[in-house]
């Protein structure tokens, strides 16, 4: 999916104090009463708030064209909050709101517009606090303690709609067909939009729009909606509403199919790291029943147990799935970690910024490639040596790229706190449970443990065991590698304590953690090695990398490794550096079912859905980027298991599918060589 730069909205204000789009020459809402217009046209036009009480599911999905000032969303949120307060035991507990916006407003303009509606102030303030950077693609925002999911898709709706994942098909309960008037914004109002609305709507899904233009009515009818004209708001004579009478058949690539979990009331998670904890929380937020089994006596004893880890996006300037995923993952992670802190979840951290140095020609070439993209300066910006040094507090010796929203946090603290939070929310934990075997018996998964020697059974299982993922018979063919990494703990000095930012070079160095007066410097990279003993040569290599990359300044000589303080963990890595998240693919069945796949596609044969192990899911291959990727992959997995809309486009989701390496070869008619993952 191509992600062109996003231009923010340019506003003026008319005599009535209503914001006007300079791009479209049209007002954002009625001069008479924007709030009443929203309530009449979009909520009442779709049968809300009365439909809340009649909704048959626990989640109601809305979609909108033109987020604008967020007035429609804020009004709906207010009405839903009132409904929940009056009907706490109702079936409906969550809202999912999907909106497309080509020219997002800046926060200051949002704040100015929101002053018109003091009754929405508490909701508007929360929205502005989470307002995303102007980056193309989807920004998932969790509000109201997870009861409301807002997916803001920035970009041209006609470009975005064809690239949406099939998880949005037959999902939308109500469409708010907003945006500027057809005469002012003719490019939006076309058959691409109308057909996508029908494809995404559930049977019985509705729409409402302020316009009664004939070509809009005809386009929606042709797409499959039953359309009616009703009295318009205020001085407008007519508006349109409608309903989709029957489900529309939709198509997607069957080889990247993402099956949901048939039941979510008995889920076992195997693992004890950060992605296990975040997956548990994402499932619990959806009212799942979760039991976690961890081989260790405490959480965060593996790769998630480090004292400090850097958080920053992985950019490459290629606008490919890797960059799109990690840009989305980073911004989602920062929002989620900040929300956790606001909730009182404590973990050592500093949002101090991260500087990536151009320490040699190769790294300079990579950074120059990254900077060819017109990034918002709040995400990434080119900096000279002098600028980076002023920010870092020490001479950085090189120019480079600066990530102002990055920083460091303590993975061990965070994981432990998240596990405790999950238990408070109802998760059952069993530590000291060493899983040795998974067996499918009578429609259930049998979990066979060696320590203690007990068997458990669950309907659904999520494997989140890091580098141990390939140990099970169902996952042994996944192309994963174990990579040992030793992080050195360095006592601070008066000079080193001046470092105010994380420095990344051919390694990384963190600022001092005030809690222990140490820095972290790392990390070694030993593929295929799962031992975690201290090694003096790796300790020395961590120091030497810093000295090699910054040879012209003296302060790195202050790094003292003589006390041999370090921690070693084992990462789960993969060749393309992207996580694996989704249903566990059935290796043998995939090869048998997709033999001669190109010919079958060419001849138009029916292609069956990708074979997977039933009710068995996984999340892994986070490598050394788990702090960045774990929150989003946990959200992706939970959304898949519950059959909800995904926060990424089709191409990027396919690049995360655990079967992707096999499918790519099969689509080219090439053989898939059987291999067992590198464990030791």
Swiss-Prot record:
Region named FAD-dependent cmnm(5)s(2)U34 oxidoreductase: 270-680
Needed co-factor(s): FAD
A biological-process GO annotation: tRNA wobble uridine modification
Any Gene Ontology CC annotation: cytoplasm
Keywords of the record: Cytoplasm, FAD, Flavoprotein, Methyltransferase, Multifunctional enzyme, Oxidoreductase, S-adenosyl-L-methionine, Transferase, tRNA processing
Main location: cytoplasm
Species this chain originates from: Yersinia enterocolitica serotype O:8 / biotype 1B (strain NCTC 13174 / 8081)
Family as reported in the entry's similarity comment: In the N-terminal section; belongs to the methyltransferase superfamily. tRNA (mnm(5)s(2)U34)-methyltransferase family.
Stated role: Catalyzes the last two steps in the biosynthesis of 5-methylaminomethyl-2-thiouridine (mnm(5)s(2)U) at the wobble position (U34) in tRNA. Catalyzes the FAD-dependent demodification of cmnm(5)s(2)U34 to nm(5)s(2)U34, followed by the transfer of a methyl group from S-adenosyl-L-methionine to nm(5)s(2)U34, to form mnm(5)s(2)U34.
UniProt-recorded name of the protein: tRNA 5-methylaminomethyl-2-thiouridine biosynthesis bifunctional protein MnmC
